[in-house]
């Protein structure tokens, strides 16, 4: 009997790792997260697009582990802000002070609504973008894969 293939998810989010593990277990694929590799620190996202950041993370982890890696990058693009916050979504309001008990997500939303309130006639169209990359070690045949999905919507007050 063959051992299951191991795939690394470039994340420390236990929920994401568990969910992907459940999906891929049907195919005899074992999923590990970055916590299984304590020598891998945070990977700096230096890309200019969601695709570049996802690919950068997957390539880095594959080089360090020798395993196939899946990585993602995601965020919000607001048309009235020329696509901002974009790849900076998670850190959008890091330059704003936190209110008592306010989470980073809440602070990001507060900043976004404040910026949009100064543009009362601007459209509120926006989209959530998620890009995923799968990278294989050099010794495996096939090409790396990058995909992009979007969910269109509007920003409400």
Name each region found by the language model.
Residues 2-8, 14-33, 38-157:
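Anionic-ligand binding patches
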């Amino acid at each position: 009997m063959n051992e299951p293939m191991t795939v690394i998810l470039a994340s420390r989010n236990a929920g994401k790792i568990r969910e992907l593990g459940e999906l891929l277990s049907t195919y005899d694929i074992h999923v590990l997260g970055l916590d299984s590799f304590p020598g891998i620190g945070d990977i700096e996202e230096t890309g200019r697009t969601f695709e570049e950041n996802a690919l950068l993370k997957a390539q880095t982890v594959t080089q360090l582990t020798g395993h196939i890696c899946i990585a993602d990058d995601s965020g919000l693009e607001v048309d009235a802000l020329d696509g901002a916050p974009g790849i900076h979504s998670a850190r959008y309001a890091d330059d704003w002070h936190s209110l008592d008990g306010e989470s980073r997500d809440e602070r990001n939303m507060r900043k976004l609504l404040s910026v949009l309130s100064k543009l009362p006639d601007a459209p509120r169209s926006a989209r959530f973008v998620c890009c995923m990359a799968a990278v294989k070690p050099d010794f495996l045949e096939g090409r790396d894969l990058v995909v992009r999905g979007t969910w269109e919507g509007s920003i409400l007050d």
